[in-house]
Amino acid sequence: GIMISLVQMGVIALVYQVSGIGSFVLNELSLEPLFFILGLFPFWLLQGGTEEVATRGWLLTRIAARTNLPLAIAISSSLFGILHLGNSGVTFLSVLNIILDGVLAGLLLVYTDSIWLVVAQHGTWNYVQGNLLGFQVSGTGADASIFSFTMGSGPDWLTGGAFGAEGSII
């Protein structure tokens, strides 16, 4: 799960940097803020894990037991997207992307039979976005990050706008 998110966010960051959608600058950090940033990872696992246990570990499996797997993935993924509707900067594209990520998470759960892999993917995704790369995380800024991200100009569907990378077509 960790590797999946590292690759996903690494590709997104590379595309942003190379295409000029945005740029990254390494922050000058002393040991104290660096340890603080590294120490945030377990909290992202807890946050992402809570969402995954509720929408995939519980809801998806209950619906699949009563109906069928495609419907269970569709419903749990849609609920996952709906849970983000109140976030700052939310757009149709950002919710669609979150629903699609929910489908990926549902498939990962089904094919690996491991909620822990899905929790690791979700928590790492959020952590890398916010505390490593300096992106907004579903419309919320991180207090501290290894890199600072500066958004270039362009339409929100390309840059992600105020919602962050999850609101982009990339």
Task: Provide a role label for each language-model segment.
Residues 7-19, 46, 50, 79, ...:
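Alpha-helical membrane-inserting segments
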Residues 2-3, 34-38, 42-50, 70-75, 92-99, 155-170, ...:
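Hydrophobic alpha-helical transmembrane segments
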Residues 9-10, 40, 44, 68-85, ...:
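Small-polar-interrupted transmembrane alpha-helices in polytopic inner-membrane proteins
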Residues 1-53, 60-66:
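Juxtamembrane helix-loop-helix connectors linking adjacent transmembrane helices
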Residues 94-157:
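Functionally important transmembrane alpha-helices
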